[in-house]
């Protein structure tokens, strides 16, 4: 049996600044794959903690890291890249991710063009509509993480 190699990564479930009054979550459409909506995520650099990577990645991808961390998923979750997907991480079979549930402090602070853009546009959608919108190969992981945050009382919608 082959040993799979996974890239360490963080991902952010970003609730709107109006949470918990509204149950809207941030998603963004990738620049390189039209119609591919997802949560912000990115690799963990050597010597960096997952929390440090979270703040760095959010600043790079959405132009702000002004967030309140509400919870962290307690384990790594791995997923494989789809075989038909071209990706920039050819030495990896997929990614192992550490998920954070966060609340954005100021919606007007989002700037997708602050660094090299990874997303073409973004929106806040109701959490109940999330799984219909995002790329299919991430749905199971998103479902698992959201169920955990709900079950543990961190996500009240």
Curated annotation (Swiss-Prot):
Signal sequence interval, chain numbering: none
Record keywords, A-Z: Hydrolase
Residues in Nudix hydrolase domain copies: 5-147
Enzyme Commission no: 3.6.1.-
GO biological process, one term: mRNA catabolic process
GO molecular function annotations of the record: mRNA 5'-diphosphatase activity
Reported cofactor(s): a divalent metal cation
Keyword Hydrolase assigned: yes
Motif (Nudix box): 42-63
GO CC, any one term: cytoplasm
EC top class named in words: hydrolase
Protein function: Accelerates the degradation of transcripts by removing pyrophosphate from the 5'-end of triphosphorylated RNA, leading to a more labile monophosphorylated state that can stimulate subsequent ribonuclease cleavage.
NCBIfam families: PRK00714.1-3, PRK00714.1-5
Classification via HAMAP family: Nudix_RppH (MF_00298)
Family label: Belongs to the Nudix hydrolase family. RppH subfamily.
The protein, known as: RNA pyrophosphohydrolase
Species per Swiss-Prot/TrEMBL record: Helicobacter acinonychis (strain Sheeba)
Gene: rppH
